[in-house]
Amino acid sequence: MGDILIAMFGPDCNDPLQVAALNTLLTYLAGSSVSVLENIMVEKEELASSIGYWWDSRPNTVIWFQPSGVATEKLAFVEQRLFDILKDVASKPLDMNYMLDCVRRERRQLKFNAESSGSFYANGVINDFLFGKRDGSTLKDFGTISEYEKLEKWTDAQWREFLKQWISDAPHISLLGTPSKELAEKTKASEEKRLAARREELGPAGLAKLAEKLKAAIAKNDIEIPDSILRKWPVPGVESIHFIESTSARSGLAKQLGTPSNGVQKVIDRSSADLPLFLQFEHVPTNFVHITVLLGTSEVKTEHRPLLPLFMDNFFNTPIMQNGQKIEFEEVVTRLEQDTISYCMTGGGRAMNDPEGIAIQFQVEPEKYAAVVEWIRAMMFDSIFDEARLNAGLAKILADIPEAKRNGNSMMYAVDAMIHLERDSSVKARCTLVKAIYMKRLKKLLAKEPETVLSWLETLRKSLFTFNNLRALVIANVEKLPDPVEAWKPLIAGMDTKSPHLPLVKMSQRLSPDGHNPGTYGAVIVPMPTIDSSFLLSSARGPTSPTDPIIPSLMVAISFLEAVEGPLWVAVRGKGLAYGSGFKRDPDGGFIQFSVYRSPDAYRAFAAAKAVVESYINGEAKFEQHALEGAI
């Protein structure tokens, strides 16, 4: 696989109407599986696994397109095909209904980001400082989103002219990156030759002189700041940190965890309607609703677990049956986008600290709350496993694998999963090394025996979507939420609600013998000629519960060691041994892990970090009070 990167200048970053139009147009072109470029190049022609896009703030913005997962021999063709499609789109009437959907969706997402993302305002202020007018008038545009009302009135001709001016007919630069074994070997040999020549040029005396110079620089850099100076700026108390406070309430099976006594719980009790579904509510001051449905994988057969990546990719990108009629996936995605701010199916680790689980997530406006529950049921039970859609999903997964295999950090964690987890682990089944083998076989089987693959997927569906395997979390302003419990009735209609609730499986229950005794396998070295840096991951046993009394002390210790200009920073990053290093606590798997990120010599970075930790253990290094206060 090769790389393509395309860049062109865009409109003035200080023009809110032009910037809003650019965001909307990029969404129209490549924002989802039904957008023009994604639908043609990814879903239908299978030329790429995705079409990435973004823009950088400059006086003239810079627009970027990046098709990923492109076969090396097709790089030039795909680059040309992208512009052929863009010119074709600009030459014909646009789908103005979908364009209007994109305008409204962009506005919803902007409102959502303004509420939920700290960087939204920070980036706006920074961009105003760098590029805005000196009188501060540019920043006032942040106080309104009226530009989207204007865009709703734009005509087809205006949109097409904008597309031609800034994208389809604009001057651009295309970079095509072709992998080359010869160049990799040549670069390595050239670097070795350069170092040897430099050593010879300096000689023993020159090297010794440079070593002394380096030693003097390190000594100067390591001069400690007097404690009396640091004490002039006391660390603020934790009470000065303003958290978003939430009030919990529960319904159905969630009450087995306890029933809170508060006003929000009374609201839920009034609308519970004897619904047995496990529902956890978190009441916060928000204008939106965050919905997560957590699914366990304990009932998924071992042989079906490697199907999970395909199942998850296909979940929202497949036809459904409604009232006896087949609704094609393009219409499904279009309707989903009309009703939501965002949606996805992802691993439970990222969403709910349940790595072995699967999570369905939605962010919506309160008035769409009930509609989303209907969507969840429709995608669970009314979706159709379509051969064409499955083939497209497999093509995307396979196209992404070479890029993942060129990523040192990604491969490090993939190898870690292969060593420390057993065959029944969903995390292991979804990792790159399993996908690389299984998906190729699955693609061949789908071509020869499609009914076999479809039957496997149906079995997987039935093992996931059962009443006793569902847990739902709703984060919203519950007091203003219409029918907070009643809205979930359609989801469990017709389900067997008598079966006992299935417990969630912790990753520590899916460990291999080597996972139970980390270190017994020994050191694993994975040569990767595609990268210049090295990466390292070291695992040891750790707490297996988030309520373990050692957790607070462990958190403070890690925070202390990892502080900017702290012990690890100075010993590893400060001396050029790695771009980054740090500890990770994983109570779900029962590990404490230390990682080194982008190092010229990962072992030296590990040894330096080890020496730092040991110096605090044996008392050679002292814990500075102000540093501990900052860590807390």
Task: Report residues per predicted region.
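Active-site-adjacent "gating/activation" loops or surface patches in catalytic cores
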Residues: 1-5, 13-15, 251-306, 529-534, ...
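Prokaryote-biased recognition of long, low-complexity C-terminal linker/tail segments
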Residues: 199, 489, 493-554
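Non-catalytic regulatory/linker segments of enzymes
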Residues: 284-306, 325-361, 534, 538
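Bilobed periplasmic-binding protein/Venus flytrap-like ligand-binding cleft at the lobe interface
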Residues: 21-32, 82-87, 556-563, 609-614
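Active/ligand-binding-proximal structured segments within catalytic/core domains
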Residues: 6, 16-29, 286-331, 376, ...
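Low-complexity, glycine/alanine/valine/leucine- and proline-rich hydrophobic stretches
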Residues: 564-580
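Charge-rich, well-structured scaffold segments of protease-associated domains
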Residues: 1-15, 34-253, 331-510, 576-632
